[in-house]
Amino acid sequence: MPGDKQEAKNATQKTEEGVHITEALITKRNLTFPEDEDLSEKMFHTLDDLETVRLDGEGITCIGNLERLRNIHSLYLQSNKIQRIENLACITSLRFLSLAGNQIRHVENLLDLQYLQFLDLSENLIETLKLDELPQSLLILNLCGNPCTNQDGYRKMVIGALPLLLDLDKQPILERWTSDEEDKSSDEEEEFPELNGPFCAERGFFKDLEQELHQHQERRQQAALTEHLSRMETQPVLTDLPLLPAVPMAGDCSPAVTEEPGKEAAPKATSSTQMASSSKKQVPRNQKGSVQARKGALAATASKTSLAAAPSMTKSTNKRGTK
């Protein structure tokens, strides 16, 4: 269909010169919204609102078609096949530009970017560096991996040409790191978070982070040791618990005896063997009653017979006494 062909043409506009930046490509990488019929008008207003555009790793060979990106402050074009720096004058608000890993041979067409603070041109093919082509507003510049960095006096010349530069090729310019500069840089980084990228972070960030983590670990170890020592010094507290009431053993019919407060408890058996022997010697109460009844009956009978046979009993008694 004609519409599909046109869309494919806009998405990957390939000519003999290479791959160009298109609005369709920008939309594909940086915008997401539902499909509808009136897409062109919506795209127009949305592109105007973009502040960060990522087009890295798309095989782009030429920079162009950025006129609608009026408000962007960060542009990522690394890992492409770009050979020239061009067509950037239309985005004067740009603060962050990454062109690392391309095929650029010359630094040019950057003077219109008066607010540019971060420029990454590492891993390109720049042999001769034209310092007058670099914006004076630069704070961070990375040219690592270019032949021009091997030139005698290269670092001194770049620092002298850029009075605001604070970091060159991942190395801070120590003589320019004053408190005023740090306060100014922190304010700008809060406004533009892209300035907190890997090259900014290497200005002592990881060293400070490692030191802070080490101090935190030492504090935790000290706290654990203090807690351990305090626990070792603490003596256990013994409390007097009330005695539980005695539980009768199996086969014992005697009621449980509760001790009155203030009286000492009677000594108890110290072994199960003694308890067993004592239980065997005890006579039930009902058996004692029957024995006493029989003794009473015998006593009554004896009294009656004694009246009838008194002489004989006396005689027998005398005989026992003589014996």
From Swiss-Prot:
InterPro entries: Cilia_flagella_integrity, Leu-rich_rpt, LRR_dom_sf. SMART domains: LRR_SD22 (SM00365). Residues 269-290 have a biased composition (Polar residues). LRR repeats lie at residues 49-70, 71-92, 93-114, 115-135. Disulfide bonds: none annotated. Residues 297-310 have a biased composition (Low complexity). The modification Phosphothreonine is found at residue 178. Residues 146-188 form the LRRCT domain. One of its GO terms (cellular component) is motile cilium. It comes from the Eukaryota. GO terms for biological process: sperm flagellum assembly; spermatogenesis. The modification Phosphoserine is found at residues 179, 185-186, 303. Residues 203-228 form a coiled coil. Pfam families: LRR_9. Residues 252-323 are annotated as: Disordered. Keywords: Cell projection, Cilium, Coiled coil, Differentiation, Flagellum, Leucine-rich repeat, Phosphoprotein, Repeat, Spermatogenesis. It is found in: Cell projection, Cilium, Flagellum. Its main location: other. PANTHER family: LEUCINE-RICH REPEAT-CONTAINING PROTEIN 46, PROTEIN PHOSPHATASE 1 REGULATORY SUBUNIT SDS22-RELATED. Required for normal spermatogenesis and male fertility. Plays an important role in sperm flagellum biogenesis. This is Leucine-rich repeat-containing protein 46. The lineage of its organism: Eukaryota, Metazoa, Chordata, Craniata, Vertebrata.
